[in-house]
UniProtKB/Swiss-Prot annotation:
It comes from Vibrio campbellii (strain ATCC BAA-1116). The keyword ATP-binding applies. InterPro entries: AAA+_ATPase, CheY-like_superfamily, Homeodomain-like_sf, HTH_Fis, P-loop_NTPase, QS_regulatory_LuxO, Sig_transdc_resp-reg_receiver, Sigma_54_int. Residues 133-362 form the Sigma-54 factor interaction domain. The lineage of its organism: Bacteria, Pseudomonadati, Pseudomonadota, Gammaproteobacteria, Vibrionales. PROSITE patterns: RESPONSE_REGULATORY, SIGMA54_INTERACT_2, SIGMA54_INTERACT_3, SIGMA54_INTERACT_4. PANTHER family: PTS-DEPENDENT DIHYDROXYACETONE KINASE OPERON REGULATORY PROTEIN-RELATED (PTHR32071:SF117), TRANSCRIPTIONAL REGULATORY PROTEIN (PTHR32071). This is Luminescence regulatory protein LuxO. Keywords: ATP-binding, DNA-binding, Nucleotide-binding, Phosphoprotein, Repressor, Transcription, Transcription regulation, Two-component regulatory system. Disulfide bonds: none annotated. Changing residue 97 to A: Constitutive luminescence. The modification 4-aspartylphosphate is found at residue 47. One of its GO terms (molecular function) is ATP binding. It comes from the Bacteria. Transmembrane segments: none annotated.
Length: 453
């Protein structure tokens, strides 16, 4: 931490101590640069105003010698334009002083997590952020915590989420983090297998059990012995087979199709659906007793549109992988493409993002993804809707009228809150540039300070 005011440095140290972070505090830019000769930090918190040089000078020096070290600027209200400029030169983020404890912790935690992810990907090509996942949004942090807590248990996990959110990736993450990680992970898609074959796929069959059964065959249950059995799109399973599945879950035993012998296996059940499982129970399409057997630990995967900055993290990770695979040289997205990605709803979630990027990489060349390369519907003008929604009174009176700046302030503050503090994303929804929001925040903060004097 580069902060020349001792009391502020001590306060911020107390905020970050619960994270278990080792913090080295220096008071000048020269000391900060010199300290890099002895120890390279995971993150630098840098004040813009220092007694011997500017924060921008320190930024340039650090980026020249250690370009991979992430830097977060801390700035007073009057220095926001400088902070925005600093981000253009390599700063990862900036915080407005005075900074609240929660905001500081989240920003620092995210920056360290992202830096660790990038380092791991450089050391181990193809390695992802967390057990195959990419993303550090608060919604995904909750998913990671649930996986960490539940992985070691044998309790059944029921994953819900829209199509394309990564339910199988989640199931694989649970398996990899469990004590069964070195045992088989067997997935069966209940929606992709014909009704008359799914029992055989699940439990296996003996020779002659039905037309075409020329040999004995192991099913998914037997193949998963000792490991994890993942039942994807479980709510598509026929009710008759649900009865047999319930018995299998209760006893750990099953019969192959055409056999009278019982087989016993030890499997951990993970299942998933893109429907509401309880609604399926209420409408008679899913057995209630099976629901209670499997719905022990619910785990909901958020849609991509609710994951904030994860969209761009995922996009960059996929771009690097696909460019290498297709022999292309793409390395970045144009700013208007980033804004389009952030404002788009992504009804097909991560799977749609994968398809969009594959289309772009295969059909185009260059180093930068530009707006004209986007396929439909992303190449169409975006009709934006304000994230901030106001309830209009039926009849407005003079007393209901607010100053225009106050209405604007409410809209911006609500948009920032809805976007989890992501100002560039909020700006995209409001159809203004991020710098416009920063300037307005600066003006309102100055107004508040004058009123408090």
């Amino acid at each position: 931490m580069v902060e020349d005011t001792a009391s502020v440095a001590a306060l911020y140290r107390s905020y970050l101590t619960p994270l278990g972070i080792d913090i080295n505090i220096v008071g000048t830019g020269r000391d900060a640069i010199e300290s890099l000769n002895h120890r390279i930090p995971d993150l630098i918190l840098l004040d813009l105003r220092l007694p011997d040089m500017t924060g921008m000078d320190v930024l340039h020096a650090v980026k020249k010698s250690h370009p991979d070290v992430p830097i977060i600027f801390m700035t007073a209200h009057g220095s926001i334009d400088t902070a925005v400029e600093a981000m253009r030169h390599g700063s990862q983020d900036f915080l407005i002083k005075p900074c609240e404890a929660d905001r500081l912790r989240v920003t620092v935690n995210n920056a360290i997590r992202k830096a660790t992810k990038l380092k791991n990907e450089a050391d181990n090509p193809g390695n992802q952020n967390y057990q195959g996942f990419i993303g550090s949004s608060q919604t995904m942090q909750q998913v990671y915590r649930t996986i960490d807590s539940a992985a070691s248990s044998k309790a059944s996990i029921f994953i819900t989420g829209e199509s394309g959110t990564g339910k199988e990736v989640c199931a694989e993450a649970i398996h990899a983090a469990s004590k069964r990680g070195d045992k088989p992970f067997i997935a069966i898609n209940c929606a992709a297998i014909p009704k008359d074959l799914i029992e055989s796929e699940l439990f296996g069959h003996v020779k002659g059990a039905f037309t075409g059964a020329a040999n004995d065959r192991q099913g998914a249950a037997e193949l998963a012995d000792g490991g994890t059995l993942f039942l994807d799109e479980l709510c598509e399973m026929d009710l008759d087979l649900q009865t047999k599945l319930l018995r299998f879950i209760q006893t750990g035993t099953f019969q192959k199709v055409g056999s009278s012998k019982m087989k016993s296996v030890d499997v951990r059940f993970v299942c998933a659906t893109n429907r509401d499982p309880w609604k399926e129970v209420q409408e008679g399409r899913f057995r209630e007793d099976l629901y209670y057997r499997l719905y022990v630990i619910p785990l909901h995967l958020p849609p991509l549109r609710e994951r904030g900055k994860d969209v761009i993290e995922i996009a960059y990770s996929l771009l690097g992988y696909m460019s290498h695979e297709e022999g292309k040289s793409f390395v970045r997205f144009a700013q208007d493409v980033i804004e389009r990605f952030n404002s788009y709803e992504w009804p097909g979630n991560v799977r749609q993002l994968q398809n969009v990027l594959r289309n772009i990489v295969v059909l185009n060349n260059g180093k930068e993804i530009t707006l004209d390369m986007l396929p439909p519907p992303l190449n169409q003008p975006v009709v934006r809707q304000s994230v901030a929604k106001f309830i209009e009174p039926d009849i407005m009176t003079v007393s209901d009228i607010m100053p225009l700046w106050m209405t604007e302030k409410m809209a911006i503050e609500q948009a920032i809150q809805a976007c989890e503090g992501n100002i560039p994303r909020a700006a995209g929804y409001l159809d203004v540039s991020p710098s416009t929001i920063y300037r307005k925040l600066q003006a309102w903060n100055s107004k508040d300070e004058k009123q408090n004097v």
